[in-house]
Amino acid sequence: LPMEPSGSLPVLAIGGWGADGVSQAASTADGRARFVDSTLVLMERHGFLGVDIDWEYPGTSAGGIKSRAEDVENWYALLSLLRDGLDKRTAATGQKHTLSVAVGAGDSLLKPIDPARLNALADQVVVMAYDLCGFDRETGHHAALYPDDNSRQSGARAVRTLKQGGLSADKILLGIPAYGRMWRQVSGRAVTQTAGISGTKGLNFPD
C-alpha cells in the first residue's frame, strides 16, 4: 500500500498467488460488472486512488486456482470495464484513478498476452521478474536480470517481449523479489545452473 506522503497513490491490490475466484467472477458479463462495482465502492470508501489486478494467472490453474480456456479474453473484458469505471471516477472527482496490472515474466505466461491491447488499458504493468525457476528438477536463478547460456528467461527478456509487442516502456515496472530459492541434494560438485536437484525451498530475507 503506497502512502501519500511519498508522493505516490494509495492503491488497492486484488489477487496474488493462490487467490481463487477471479476466473469465476470474470466468466460472465454480470460477474464482471459486480466485480468492478464492488471494487469501485471499496476504493471510494477507503480513499484508494488506484487498483492493482494481480491474477496469477489467466488460463492456468497455477496456485491451485480454477481456470478456463476463456480466461485471457475475460481478463481483457474485466480490465476494460474497470478502466471505464476508473475513468468515470477521474472525471467526477478530478483526481486521477489508476489501473495497474501484474503479469508473469516467464515465456509461457507472456505468450497469451497482447501487449498493445494491455497498453490501451493499463497505466502501469508490473512484470513479476521472479520465480522463473524453482518448480522443476534443475537449479537456476529464479530472478535473473539477464539471460545466460543456461537459461533464456530473465527480467530483461520479459521487458523486451512486452515492448516489442506494443507496451510503452514508461508503463513497465520491474518487480524484484525479497526472497531467494534453495536447492536440496544437488547432483555433482559443480556449482552451476541446470544441475539436478531433489527439491526446492523458499528463503525470505529479513527486513
Residue ranges of predicted features:
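Conserved beta-strand positions in the central sheet of alpha/beta enzyme cores
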Residues: 11-13, 47, 52-54, 126, ...
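Serine-hydrolase-like catalytic core of hydrolytic proteins
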Residues: 35, 39-43, 50-52, 56-57, ...
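Glycan-recognition patch characteristic of GH18 chitinases/ENGases
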Residues: 1-44, 70
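Short loop/turn segments at strand-loop or loop-helix junctions that form parts
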Residues: 14-17, 55-58, 129
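Gly/Ser/Thr-rich helix-start
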Residues: 16-17, 51, 141, 181
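Substrate-binding surface in catalytic domains of secreted glycosidases
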Residues: 58-207
